[in-house]
From Swiss-Prot:
It catalyses: a CDP-1,2-diacyl-sn-glycerol + L-serine = a 1,2-diacyl-sn-glycero-3-phospho-L-serine + CMP + H(+). This is CDP-diacylglycerol--serine O-phosphatidyltransferase. Pathway: Phospholipid metabolism; phosphatidylethanolamine biosynthesis; phosphatidylethanolamine from CDP-diacylglycerol: step 1/2. Belongs to the CDP-alcohol phosphatidyltransferase class-I family. Keywords: Cytoplasmic vesicle, Endoplasmic reticulum, Lipid biosynthesis, Lipid metabolism, Membrane, Phospholipid biosynthesis, Phospholipid metabolism, Transferase, Transmembrane, Transmembrane helix. It comes from Schizosaccharomyces pombe (strain 972 / ATCC 24843). InterPro entries: CDP-alcohol_PTase-I, CDP-diaglyc--ser_O-PTrfase, CDP-diaglyc--ser_O-PTrfase_fun, CDP-OH_P_trans, CDP-OH_PTrfase_TM_dom, CDP_ALCOHOL_P_TRANSF_CS. The gene is pps1. Its EC number is 2.7.8.8. Its main location: endoplasmic reticulum.
Length: 240
């Protein structure tokens, strides 16, 4: 008896084709839905949880801005900005589990997840770091590039996720580059600085090249390393 064998490459192509067809069918159903609030109707429970992730990220940004508006006198707002980010991480973990548990995903699910992650783990940590004292021109350029690295990493994930090997539950087996929520480690470093009163002019290792256009804080190099790790293609991080 002859057994047919399907190569892993062909299987991945078949899975990707099936997912593409499913996405096209969902898109057609959404475009042809002329009911009121069709956008809201298209959202699933997992999408609402993803929106909570984005909500926490936006609230973190507002809390950081409140700290700056207070004349940097009330650390209460800065701590609030920091506390919102772990809640965003909780919702980021939860939305995927709920989607797999219910066996349902919406047309916008993956895009919503990436956009929410960009706010909560890209823009929010950068604004938080700025409020902690990374405020020179070069600091802000580096923080901007850090956010762009997160944006690029998420865009790459969206276009390549179908080609990444999956486990039995349909979950990707690894990440290409560090996932963007790992940027919370940088937030933790900033939190330790706040706790020890090492912010603004008291940041560890001070300010280099002061009173020049190239002034920067050495600690901002951590954001450079994080951006490089996120955009690396050779770095494979097992997905838990």
């Amino acid at each position: 008896m002859v057994r047919s064998r399907v190569s892993p490459g062909l299987k991945l192509q078949s899975d990707a084709s099936n997912q593409s067809n499913d996405k096209e069918n969902k898109l057609l159903a959404y475009v042809n839905d002329n009911r009121h609030f069709s956008l809201i109707r298209a959202l699933h429970l997992a999408d609402l949880i993803t929106l909570m992730n984005g909500f926490c990220g936006v609230m973190s940004i507002f809390s950081s801005l409140r700290y700056c508006l207070s004349g940097q006198q009330s650390a209460f707002h800065l701590w609030n900005a920091m506390y919102f980010m772990p809640f965003a991480l909780f919702f980021d973990f939860l939305d995927g589990k709920v989607a797999r548990w219910r066996g349902k995903s919406s047309l916008m699910g993956q895009e919503l997840d990436s956009l929410a992650d960009l706010i909560s783990f890209g823009v929010s940590p950068a604004v938080f770091a700025f409020c902690c004292g990374f405020q020179t021109f070069l600091d802000t350029v580096i923080l901007s590039l850090f956010v762009l690295c997160g944006l690029t990493r998420l865009a790459r994930f969206n276009v390549s996720v179908n080609s990444i090997p999956k486990d039995g539950s349909g979950k990707s087996q690894f990440f290409e580059g560090t996932p963007i929520p790992t940027t919370l480690s940088l937030v933790t470093v900033c939190g330790v600085c706040i706790l020890k009163g090492k912010t603004h002019e008291n940041l560890p290792w001070g300010e280099w090249c002061g009173n020049t256009p190239f002034a920067f804080h050495p600690l901002v190099v951590l954001f450079v390393l994080s951006g490089i790790a996120m955009t690396s293609k050779k770095l494979k991080v097992p997905k838990i």
